[in-house]
Amino acid sequence: MSTGIETAGVPDAVIPELVIISGMSGAGRSTAAKCLEDLGWFVVDNLPPALIPTMVELGARSQGNVARIAVVVDVRGRRFFDNLRESLADLESKNVTRRIVFLESSDEALVRRFESVRRPHPLQGDGRIVDGIDAERELLRELRGDADLVIDTSSLNVHELRAKMDAQFAGDEEPELRATVMSFGFKYGLPVDADLVVDMRFLPNPHWVPELRPFTGLNEEVSAYVFNQPGAKEFLDRYAELLRLIAAGYRREGKRYVTIAVGCTGGKHRSVATSEKLAARLAAEGVETVVVHRDMGRE
């Protein structure tokens, strides 16, 4: 069946899935969008509703590179709402499948959230926060009625909302975890984005071995020296097992990214060799892993 989306001259055109995220300000639209992004969706924030059909057409022309599109729609005025209705009707006439996810919360929860960040509601004008909430709720009433999925976030924290989104959109796949393993030198300071820190200074320093000093932990002889030290292999085995446990917990909590910082004195020998070994272990467990040697070559 033809979809009506213009894909002339594009072989194997695939019409992307489309999810439209909308709802009350402060109800968790950004969190829902970030969850879909982490699940591999192409997310566009605050796209004018009139451009949604164009976005779908561009996705269809990507030859499968953009197979799932999520658009966050912030309806702040009647004209935007009318444009959204027109775009949805246009997509429906072209047989494009779309889902609307609507995020809502109680007045009390929304007031509490706006007060906690000390920001006004975008529609309150010179009135109170609750006035803005009332205006937005009335403006979105019809869209809420058209929603395929309504999520009330009044009593949900960020992790619980992510779990609900995962349940709807992750399918049977376990959420992926992406790890950055970063070697560093303590004398240059801790990485500010580290979630976990490993200190390899309990092992002898190859710096004091003249024939190894010029090389880095990427060198096979340096790596062999490090992991032939007493306790080195046992540490690697035990820490890899600990990471397996931590990774499972991160997935349950909806955490998608983790940075493991592995340090030694200068970030040249022990930390580099260990980072490479840990990254290989993580990759073997199915964790998408990137290795960064922050301070190598800095001395």
From Swiss-Prot:
<protein>
    <recommendedName>
        <fullName>Nucleotide-binding protein SAV_6292</fullName>
    </recommendedName>
</protein>
<comment type="function">
    <text>Displays ATPase and GTPase activities.</text>
</comment>
<keyword id="KW-0067">ATP-binding</keyword>
<dbReference type="InterPro" id="IPR053931">
    <property type="entry name" value="RapZ_C"/>
</dbReference>
<dbReference type="InterPro" id="IPR027417">
    <property type="entry name" value="P-loop_NTPase"/>
</dbReference>
<dbReference type="InterPro" id="IPR053930">
    <property type="entry name" value="RapZ-like_N"/>
</dbReference>
<keyword id="KW-0342">GTP-binding</keyword>
<dbReference type="Pfam" id="PF03668">
    <property type="entry name" value="RapZ-like_N"/>
</dbReference>
<comment type="similarity">
    <text>Belongs to the RapZ-like family.</text>
</comment>
<dbReference type="InterPro" id="IPR005337">
    <property type="entry name" value="RapZ-like"/>
</dbReference>
<keyword id="KW-0547">Nucleotide-binding</keyword>
<feature type="binding site">
    <location>
        <begin position="74"/>
        <end position="77"/>
    </location>
    <ligand>
        <name>GTP</name>
    </ligand>
</feature>
<dbReference type="Pfam" id="PF22740">
    <property type="entry name" value="PapZ_C"/>
</dbReference>
<dbReference type="GO" id="GO:0005524">
    <property type="term" value="F:ATP binding"/>
</dbReference>
<feature type="binding site">
    <location>
        <begin position="23"/>
        <end position="30"/>
    </location>
    <ligand>
        <name>ATP</name>
    </ligand>
</feature>
<dbReference type="GO" id="GO:0005525">
    <property type="term" value="F:GTP binding"/>
</dbReference>
